[in-house]
Amino acid sequence: MHLIIAGREYSGSTTLSQTFGEWGAANMEGGRWGPNEYHDHWKLPHISNFSPPPPDEVASVVACYPDARDGDYTRTGLSHEEQAQIMALSPKLKEMVQRYHLQYHLHPSFYGQDDHIMVGAHFDEGILGPIYFDYGGDGQYADRRVSNRSYEKQILELGPDTILVLVTASPDAIRQRMKDNPHLHGALQDADVERVLARYEEEYADSLLTRKTRLDTTSATIEESTGEIIEKITALMTDDDRQRIKGGAA
């Protein structure tokens, strides 16, 4: 299965990638469905792989990274010092790192695996770069509105069955989540919520990926949204992937 789950910070895209991964581990034959097998690396400065801590180390990890208390360890892959080093890079270097980083994840070796799941990918990188990091904007080098379509052409060549899921939520819900569990070194600012949500909608509308769907997490529980994303993804799977579901049905 080739899958991209995209959504603004606090929308639930990372949470749902994790719960969908848990479903995949329990219900899909073959593939790699470990807790960090999906690729969620495009929200600067959180661009490194992470490893969920063993139970006896959870408390110490949460003490160092308080926003991991709900079990989201995607912002723990780099030390605080390393995150500061990433953020100290010039816009030119940030652009280069992210461009090379994304291109690496479009290597045919990834698409040769049974499953290749990215979270955010060119959506996160191409939207956050121009708004917060002064690169890839209109008229700048590697304009992300242009390069995102180029990335999608590559994706369609490598994985024409790629499914795109846009996870969204209302501005009020996003702001409440920002208040309830602020992310360490998160990019999103209160004043930009509507603007950033609008950019995700634009990218979704302009996407060349035709197997696409969306879900709104505004008022849904995690369990309800998990059920919805499973239903919507399985409806868009290839027949081969659907046959990998244990028991033959979702």
Cite the ranges covered by each PLM segment:
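Loop/turn-to-beta-strand initiation segments
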Residues: G112-H116, D161-I163
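Glycine-rich phosphate-binding P-loop
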Residues: I5-F20
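Structural recognition of the conserved hydrophobic beta-strand(s) that form the central parallel beta-sheet
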Residues: H116-V119, V167
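Conserved substrate/cofactor phosphate-moiety recognition/catalytic segment
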Residues: Q18-P108, D124, L128-P130
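A glycine- and Lys/Arg-enriched "phosphate-lid" helix/loop adjacent to the NTP-binding pocket
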Residues: E125-E202, Q243-K246
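NTP-dependent small-molecule kinase module
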Residues: G24, D180-L184, L188-A250
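Pre-Walker A (Motif I) flank of P-loop NTPase domains
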Residues: M1-L3
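Phosphate-binding beta-loop-alpha motif at adenosine-nucleotide cofactor sites
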Residues: A6-G7, D161-A169, A173, R177, ...
